[in-house]
């Protein structure tokens, strides 16, 4: 064994701020934070639904709070942003071929958004 100390390069905690790719990545991954709050709000709402009408009305009043509405809007925008980045990566990760020819990337992305719109419409009709 050697007594020599190996060189360990110092890495600052904010190293990712200097690279646009990593800033974008961190922003995309940070979209989960408002979604966590949204999920907690809904879970709390389910608990209130089980407790009875008074608890349910209290939860509805809580959800009408402007801060909660703002958090929900940020969560929606974050999930749409995350979906957009995911959909734009999909043609690169899994190229699709029809009759031996590659399908245009824009068509793949637009098809995914059309599926989201269709499913959202079905959910709105059913609920």
From Swiss-Prot:
What's the short name of a Pfam family annotated to this entry? Fumarate_red_C
A GO MF term = succinate dehydrogenase activity
Coiled-coil ranges (or none): none
Q: What is its main location?
A: membrane
| Subcellular compartments | Cell inner membrane
Q: Which UniProt keywords apply?
A: Cell inner membrane, Cell membrane, Membrane, Transmembrane, Transmembrane helix
Transmembrane residue ranges: 30-50, 58-78, 107-127
Q: Gene Ontology cellular component?
A: fumarate reductase complex; plasma membrane
SUPFAM superfamilies annotated for this entry?
Fumarate reductase respiratory complex transmembrane subunits (SSF81343)
Question: What membrane topology term does the record carry?
Answer: Multi-pass membrane protein
Cross-referenced HAMAP family, in alphabetical order? Fumarate_red_C (MF_00708)
Q: What does this protein do?
A: Anchors the catalytic components of the fumarate reductase complex to the cell membrane, binds quinones.
Quaternary assembly? Part of an enzyme complex containing four subunits: a flavoprotein (FrdA), an iron-sulfur protein (FrdB), and two hydrophobic anchor proteins (FrdC and FrdD).
Q: Which family does it belong to?
A: Belongs to the FrdC family.
Q: What is this protein called?
A: Fumarate reductase subunit C
* Gene name of this polypeptide: frdC
């Amino acid at each position: 064994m050697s007594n020599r100390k190996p060189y360990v390069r110092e890495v600052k905690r904010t190293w990712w701020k200097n690279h646009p790719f990593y800033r974008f990545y961190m922003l995309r991954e940070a979209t989960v934070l408002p979604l966590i709050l949204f999920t907690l709000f809904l879970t709390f709402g389910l608990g209130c639904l089980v407790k009875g009408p008074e608890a349910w009305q209290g939860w509805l009043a809580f959800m009408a709070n402007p801060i909660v509405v703002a958090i929900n809007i940020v969560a929606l925008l974050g999930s749409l942003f995350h979906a957009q980045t995911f959909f734009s990566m999909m043609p690169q990760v899994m190229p699709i071929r029809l009759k031996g020819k590659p399908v245009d990337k824009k068509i793949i992305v637009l098809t995914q958004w059309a599926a989201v719109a269709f499913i959202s419409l079905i959910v709105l009709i059913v609920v």
